[in-house]
């Protein structure tokens, strides 16, 4: 919405209401079992014993888990229901300052997601028909009943505020710049209550029972960044660009949270030079562009190494519900024994890890022939990851201590290679066509360092 000639605002709302209802299939991979049943059951394997729909026919399970598909109905097997709701609100504003080319922009987004999933897996019998006695005999009973209730809530907040500058001086000098701040925060709550076997199959509620299990988790993710970029070009022939990010992640110990990651790139359009346009080479090479770039990017290992570096691993503490033992409630008396939930020490805090850095260097050129109908692109690149977490091999704790050595940003790997692309693009009357050929060759190197003591 254009409020004035200099001020513009916008607002957007997105939402989704989704419900999935399926049979509550048993097993860890229910749909895989159904798919195997479709492809492996042959027509002679009847769904009902003696073709009587009141009695499910017993089919011996195959090696890949194929079963009688007639049992996989909501009335017989139970119901799986998933209710998913989302809403996203976003607002943006733009203000053109009195300084020509300088614009202020802001973006704020709110996202809410809720998931409610219920599972009610029933038991059933499968039969074989005896023609001699005309009896239906139970051949198999599915007894592993299950009832579960899952509730998942997620809230995300994201904001970005930037100053943007774009101006051309004296028709030939193009200057651009961006400076800003952005943040992201996510709060997630997850709760699962389950009962197996089910105490009361006739009521779809989870009653208080010794078979109940409860799983609850809470997670908060927070990141922040300062960003900048500055670019300059002269007649679009000489192009140079500088950029950088100063990122912070909740994953690391205060003091190791921030990392700076710069980048620079440049290009020279040789074919725009007057001496080139006047040369004979321009008759068959219509365009030439030389370019090079170097950039760095940070990785806080939120996904790659989450198992070896869990959330808040830099804090000391204990892990509850880690093992247990049956001990007496009163060792000095005659109290009965009871199971006691165990608590384990988390180990030495991981205080030595910080950002993993990914650096990328690229040198290449673009060439066009026959008025750019034939194009050639070649890139020589090298990508290096440094600071990959690894366990030092020259630090040893006594086995009796029960401690593991802290991981450190020790290792690195490198991928280098050449990318090439040839493209022919032409038009015949109203028909456009193109042919592209891509070729690449890579080389991978790994490097392992020892710890510095």
Positions of predicted regions on the chain:
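Extracellular/periplasmic, surface-exposed regions of secreted and cell-surface proteins
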Residues: 1-7, 11-17, 21, 25-26, ...
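Acidic-leaning, charged glycine-interspersed low-complexity segments
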Residues: 132-134
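Intrinsically disordered, compositionally biased low-complexity regions
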Residues: 128-130
């Amino acid at each position: 919405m254009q409020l004035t000639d200099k001020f513009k605002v916008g607002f957007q709302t997105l939402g989704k209401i989704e419900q999935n209802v399926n049979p509550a299939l048993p097993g860890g991979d229910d749909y895989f079992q159904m798919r195997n049943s479709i492809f492996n059951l042959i027509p002679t394997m009847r769904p009902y014993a003696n073709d009587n729909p009141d009695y499910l026919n017993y089919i011996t399970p195959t090696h890949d888990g194929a079963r009688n598909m007639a049992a996989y109905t909501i009335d017989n097997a139970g119901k799986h229901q998933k209710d998913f709701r989302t809403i996203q609100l976003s607002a943006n504003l733009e203000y053109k300052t009195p300084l020509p080319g300088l614009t202020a922009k802001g973006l704020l987004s709110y996202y809410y997601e809720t998931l409610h999933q219920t599972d009610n897996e029933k038991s059933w019998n499968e039969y074989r028909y005896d023609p001699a006695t005309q009896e239906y005999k139970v051949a198999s009973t599915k007894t592993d009943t299950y009832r579960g209730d899952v509730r998942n809530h997620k809230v995300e907040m994201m904001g970005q505020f930037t100053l943007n500058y774009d101006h051309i001086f004296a028709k030939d000098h193009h200057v651009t710049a961006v400076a800003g701040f952005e943040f992201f925060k996510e709060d997630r709550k997850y709760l699962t209550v389950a009962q197996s076997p089910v105490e009361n199959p006739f009521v779809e509620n989870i009653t208080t029972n010794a078979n109940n299990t409860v799983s609850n988790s809470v997670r908060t993710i927070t990141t922040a960044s300062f960003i900048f970029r500055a670019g300059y070009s002269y007649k679009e022939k000489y192009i140079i660009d500088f950029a950088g990010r100063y990122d912070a992640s909740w994953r690391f110990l205060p003091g190791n949270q921030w990392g700076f990651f710069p980048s620079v790139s440049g290009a020279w359009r040789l074919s725009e030079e007057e001496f080139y346009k006047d040369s004979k080479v321009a008759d068959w090479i219509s365009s030439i562009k030389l370019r090079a770039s170097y950039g760095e990017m940070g990785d806080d290992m939120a996904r790659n190494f989450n198992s070896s570096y869990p959330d808040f691993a830099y804090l000391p503490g204990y892990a509850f519900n880690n093992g247990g033992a049956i001990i007496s409630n009163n060792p000095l008396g005659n109290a009965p024994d009871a199971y006691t939930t165990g608590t384990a020490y988390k180990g030495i805090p991981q205080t030595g890890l910080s950002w993993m850095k990914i650096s990328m260097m690229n040198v290449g050129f673009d060439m066009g022939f026959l008025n750019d109908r034939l194009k050639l692109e070649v890139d020589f690149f090298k990508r290096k990851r440094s600071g990959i977490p690894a366990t030092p091999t020259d630090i040893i704790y006594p086995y009796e201590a029960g401690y593991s050595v802290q991981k450190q940003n020790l290792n690195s790997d490198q991928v280098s290679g050449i990318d090439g692309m040839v493209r022919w693009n032409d038009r015949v009357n109203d028909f456009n066509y193109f042919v592209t050929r891509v070729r690449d060759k890579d080389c991978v190197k790994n490097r392992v360092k020892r710890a510095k003591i």
